[in-house]
Design a protein with these regions (language model features):
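A structural signal for conserved, well-ordered secondary-structure elements
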Residues: 1-319
C-alpha cells in the first residue's frame, strides 16, 4: 500500500499554522495588542486567603465598581484568590502633576493606595482579617521592559545555539529549516495568546524556551532518520531525495506521535488539576508541544527536501 506523500503536500500542511498566525495578527489589532500581565506593564499583585466557593467574576465586578480601579484580574489559587491590577502607573501619572508623576515614590504610593483600596473592599464584603492578605507585590513598567528585552535576548541566543548545533551535526540547510520551524512554533503560541487574550507574562517566556528545546528534539529525530536513509538514495531506481524524506517521516512519525501524546497527557493533567500558576505554565506548553510535533513532521523536513532537491537540480544544470 502506497503511503500518503507528505512532502508533495507540504504547502497544504503549512496552511494550518498560517491560518492560526493570521487569525492571531487580526485579533492582535482588534484587541489593541497583547494582554500583558503586570510583569510587563507594571501593577500590583496580591494573594488573599478565602474559604468556600469563590466566584471570580462576581469578585472582579464588585472590586471594580467599589474601588473604581479597572481592569482587575481575579483568579483562584490553592489558598484563596489572586488579584492583579494593571496600568497603575499610567493612572498615577494622570492623577498627579506632571513633574511628580516621574517620581518613583509617588508611583509606589499610588500602587499602595490602590492595593489598600482593593483589600479593604474585600475585608468589608467578605468579613476578612488582616491576616487574610497572604502576599503583595508590585512591578514597574520599566522593569517590565527589561524583562521583555531579556526574554527576546534569551530566545535569540537559544535559537542561534540550536542553529549552530544542527549545522554541525547535519548541514546548514537542516539548521535553517529547523529554526524556521521553531519560529513558526513561537508564532503559533503567540497567535493563540492573541486570539484567546490570555495574559502574557514571564511564565509564557519560560514555557516558550521549554518548547524550543522540546520541539527541536523531534526535528532532530526526523533529520537523523533522513541522514541514515539517504545512503539508500538511488535516482535511477526512483529513490530520490523526496522519496527518502517521505519514507523517513513515516518511519519516525510513530515515535514522534507517541512521545507527544505521553507528554501531552502529563501537561493536560497539570492544567486540569493544577492551581492558577501551574495552569499558566501548562497552557502555553500544550500549544507549543502540539505545534512542535506538527512542524517537525510536516514543515521542517518537507521544505528541506524541496530545497535540497532544487539545489541538486541547479548543480546539474550548471554542469
Amino acid at each position: 500500500m502506497k503511503k500518503f506523500d507528505i512532502v508533495k503536500n507540504k504547502y497544504k500542511f503549512l496552511l494550518i499554522p498560517a491560518v492560526i498566525v493570521l487569525a492571531g495578527i487580526i485579533m492582535y489589532f482588534v484587541n489593541g495588542g497583547f494582554n500583558y500581565d503586570i510583569e510587563f506593564i507594571g501593577g500590583v499583585k496580591m494573594e488573599v486567603a478565602m474559604d468556600g466557593d469563590k466566584n471570580t467574576e462576581e469578585i472582579k465586578s464588585f472590586l471594580e465598581s467599589e474601588t473604581g480601579i479597572s481592569p482587575i484580574v481575579v483568579q483562584t489559587t490553592e489558598k484563596g484568590i489572586s488579584i492583579k491590577t494593571k496600568a497603575i502607573e499610567e493612572k498615577a501619572k494622570k492623577e498627579t502633576k506632571e513633574d511628580a508623576a516621574e517620581d518613583s515614590s509617588v508611583l509606589n504610593q499610588a500602587k499602595d493606595e490602590n492595593a489598600g483600596k482593593i483589600f479593604e473592599a474585600l475585608k468589608t464584603k467578605y468579613e476578612l482579617t488582616d491576616e487574610a492578605l497572604l502576599s503583595e507585590s508590585s512591578a514597574s513598567a520599566s522593569f517590565g521592559k527589561q524583562v521583555q528585552g531579556k526574554a527576546f535576548l534569551f530566545t535569540a541566543i537559544a535559537v542561534l545555539l540550536i542553529l549552530l548545533y544542527i549545522a554541525i551535526r547535519f548541514e546548514w540547510r537542516s539548521a535553517v529549516m529547523s529554526v524556521i520551524a521553531l519560529l513558526i512554533n513561537i508564532l503559533v503560541m503567540m497567535a493563540v495568546y492573541a486570539i484567546t487574550y490570555t495574559p502574557l507574562n514571564t511564565t509564557f517566556i519560560a514555557a516558550m524556551l521549554t518548547v524550543v528545546g522540546y520541539s527541536i528534539n523531534n526535528t532532530i529525530v526526523v533529520f537523523d532518520r533522513i541522514r541514515e536513509n539517504m545512503k539508500l538514495r538511488n535516482p535511477k531506481r526512483g529513490i530520490t531525495v523526496l522519496t527518502v524524506v517521505n519514507t523517513s517521516i513515516w518511519e519516525s512519525m510513530g515515535r514522534t506521535i507517541n512521545t507527544t501524546i505521553t507528554t501531552l497527557i502529563t501537561i493536560l493533567l497539570l492544567y486540569i488539576l493544577g492551581v492558577t500558576s501551574v495552569k499558566e505554565f501548562a497552557f502555553p506548553l500544550i500549544i507549543g508541544v502540539i505545534a512542535g510535533a506538527y512542524s517537525s513532521i510536516f514543515i521542517a523536513s518537507t521544505f528541506w527536501a524541496a530545497w535540497k532537491e532544487s539545489a541538486e537540480e541547479a548543480k546539474k544544470i550548471k554542469k
